[in-house]
Amino acid sequence: MENNNVISRNFDKPTIVTDDIKENCLLENTMIGGYGTAIIDRDFIQDMNKIAESIDTSNSNLIAIITDLQNKIYEYFYSKNGSSLSREKIYDEKAIVNEDGMVIGTKISDLKGMNVALCSEKSTSAYIILKNLYDNNKISRKPSLILSYLREEFSNDSNPHAFVTISKEDDLYPTKHLLYDIENPSMLEDDKKESFALVGVYALTDEEKEDIDNGYECTPTSLYEIISNYKEINAKRVYGSKDGKNNKKKKR
């Protein structure tokens, strides 16, 4: 298997992907708990492009588009009849080994319906779909795949995390970049104190987007708090730093 490129995780700065992801590109995951390298294989890319073709973009509502693609990504990776094995075990059993006996990684298409996909595979899926829609002029906002870090507010426990940022555009959400976290939904409460979950979409100012790109901490505001009367009730999420509170950005 020929490797065209590698999406590597950096310890001291985020990895930002804005170009097309090529067949057999390697996606590095954290090795904590046995998580290995994922292979972005042809079947997986074709599957994501098929999902992109099935997305209804006629009403130009980006939140509806993101909700639709998220539902389809979860249907792809999760199944009631899927495996009960651990992620580590499945990565081991499905591993691709080269002619020298070295493990290259595990095809993401082999994780279909296995109930073990995490943020890196799901965020890569979302990025490929959104990039397809953008390239075909079905959405006007350009996506980027980000490999960085995440922690909860008031916690120093920062872990590797993948998510998607979406460039700002003069549409329903003007002057705002967006951060889409497919792994973590937004828990919200309306003015009647009724709680519910929606896809995790956050608004970013220009400065916050710059912080994300440079690995500085950023605590974005839920988009729903800006465009509706909803209030986010889950713990605030802090993106973009590996060292938590000890890695605050310097004042400019």
Task: Name each region found by the language model.
Residues 121-217:
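Hydrophobic/aromatic-rich core segments of domains that either
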Residues 212-241:
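Low-complexity, Gly/Ser/Thr/Pro-rich intrinsically disordered linker/tail segments
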Residues 39-69, 133-142, 164-170, 236-248:
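Gram-negative host-targeted secretion-system effectors, predominantly Type III and Type IV
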Residues 65-69, 112-130:
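Active-site nucleophilic cysteine motif
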Residues 1-9, 33, 237-252:
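Non-Sec secretion/translocation targeting segments of pathogen effectors
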Residues 32-109:
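Secondary-structure boundary elements
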Residues 49-52, 70, 209, 227, ...:
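Residue-level detector of alpha-helical secondary structure
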Residues 1-27:
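Intrinsically disordered, low-complexity N-terminal segments that are enriched in acidic
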